[in-house]
Amino acid sequence: MTDYLLLLVGTVLVNNFVLVQFLGLCPFMGVSSRTETAIGMSFATVFVMTLASLLSYLVTTYLLVPLNLEYLTTMSFILVIAVVVQFTEMVVHKTSASLYRLLGIFLPLITTNCAVLGVALLNLRLQHGFFESIIYGFGAALGFSLVLIMFSAMREKLANADVPAPFKGTAIAMITAGLMSLAFLGFTGLVKI
């Protein structure tokens, strides 16, 4: 049980997918201008990453390895992610039309979020078991969500701040992301995974 908790904390804080491994930067910059959009994207990403990690493990263990089709790993993971995203899009459309409109193009873009594919491939490379794969995917999604929501709150504050003209917009956002990354470096050594 302690190993699972350490894996979760390590994935969320120490090896954060956005600030340490630099995966998922496109949605990180694209969806972070408003906090409500970031929260919606976070829920969708948590669901997709966790489910994609689970299904990728099952596809690898019960389909690709027994049939000696390991060379199709990346392609099969992309297919699994696309199916999970389509399912998520249908669920969000049925349950919350306002969130569906708010997320707009960003929901289908989860398919191309390299963090989702990165989680599946890292699960395979790190030889995680069933529960470890789920926890790793969930932790990566929680870390992504934490950083995305924090960053969106900071960007909303910066929109109302007196920022010099050359730094307005993307420039100050990149500086802020860099400072967040430095702050997360403080967690290095907290957990060895």
From Swiss-Prot:
What residues form the membrane-spanning segments? 5-25, 39-59, 72-92, 102-122, 134-154, 171-191
Enzyme group, top EC level? translocase
The entry's cellular-component GO terms read:
plasma membrane
Q: What is its main location?
A: membrane
Membrane protein topology class? Multi-pass membrane protein
- Name of one Pfam family that matches: Rnf-Nqr
Localization per Swiss-Prot or TrEMBL: Cell inner membrane
Q: Which GO terms describe its biological process?
A: electron transport chain
The EC code for this enzyme is: 7.-.-.-
- List keywords of the entry alphabetically: Cell inner membrane, Cell membrane, Electron transport, Membrane, Translocase, Transmembrane, Transmembrane helix, Transport
Its annotated function is as follows: Part of a membrane-bound complex that couples electron transfer with translocation of ions across the membrane.
What binding partners and quaternary form does the record give? The complex is composed of six subunits: RnfA, RnfB, RnfC, RnfD, RnfE and RnfG.
The similarity comment for this entry is: Belongs to the NqrDE/RnfAE family.
Output this protein's name.
Ion-translocating oxidoreductase complex subunit A
* Organism, as annotated: Colwellia psychrerythraea (strain 34H / ATCC BAA-681) (Vibrio psychroerythus)
